[in-house]
Amino acid sequence: MSERAPVVTIDGPSGAGKGTISQLLAKHLGWQLLDSGAIYRVLALAAIHHDVELENEESITLLAAHLDVKFLTGNEKDPVQVILEGEDVTTAIRTQECSNAASKVAAFPRVREALLRRQRAFRTAPGLIADGRDMGTVVFPTASAKLYLTASAEERAQRRYNQLQDKGFDVNIERLLAEIIERDDRDMNRPVAPLVPAEDALVIDTSDKGIDEVLELALNYINQKLSNTN
């Protein structure tokens, strides 16, 4: 790991556009990309595969410490290929069931601690875009630039609905909205590493903004912050 490699953190709730913007920023800057949410999704999927109870913090923590996961360069559709125990789970971790399970295991303090070092190891030259929920507050508190993307629950539910429909999943938008509201409450009120903007983060509401507009705002801010540190 290189402590001197610059880091840009992108935090925010599910469906706010973190993944899309993070991928575009990493491609534009030629930097590494950390999708921290994928790590928790992989852990949740591993727990499901091994019949580990999601409410059992001790068992989940043990699983996290020995998690056999690799992140490989993917394709245009899936820029990052996720391999769990030798199996490609890139699509499997994107189900709503896996998303809800990930939020549950992420609430355990010992699980978060077990995965902290693994996440920080992604910090390598020339730089890192870190996408998650506590990247700027806990994992990389001294990041070069911090962004927090948000959007209304209704807008995020619609985006998630469209995304899952495109992948061939049969989903109900009312149920999606209820699950998003429930997850927001769980993520924002957990005792360890709650979902909140870092004090020095630029907050961008993406509800009524297109991808290009958000990307331009993010790049302008990042370039400004990086120029101030050089």
Swiss-Prot record:
InterPro entries (alphabetical): Cytidylate_kin, Cytidylate_kinase_dom, P-loop_NTPase
Top enzyme category: transferase
Location, primary (coarse class): cytoplasm
Reactions catalysed, as given in the entry: CMP + ATP = CDP + ADP; dCMP + ATP = dCDP + ADP
GO biological process: nucleobase-containing small molecule interconversion; pyrimidine nucleotide metabolic process
GO molecular function terms attached to this record: ATP binding; CMP kinase activity; dCMP kinase activity
GO cellular component assignments: cytosol
Compartment(s) where it occurs, according to its Swiss-Prot or TrEMBL record: Cytoplasm
Binding site for ATP: 12-20
CDD domains in the cross-refs: CMPK
Origin: domain of life: Bacteria
Pfam families per the UniProt record, alphabetical: Cytidylate_kin
Keyword Nucleotide-binding found: yes
Enzyme nomenclature, EC number: 2.7.4.25
Keyword Nucleotide-binding: yes
The entry's keywords: ATP-binding, Cytoplasm, Kinase, Nucleotide-binding, Transferase
NCBIfam families xrefs: cmk
Family that this chain belongs to: Belongs to the cytidylate kinase family. Type 1 subfamily.
HAMAP family: Cytidyl_kinase_type1
PANTHER family attached to this UniProt entry: CYTIDYLATE KINASE (PTHR21299:SF2), CYTIDYLATE KINASE/PANTOATE-BETA-ALANINE LIGASE (PTHR21299)
Protein name stated in the entry: Cytidylate kinase
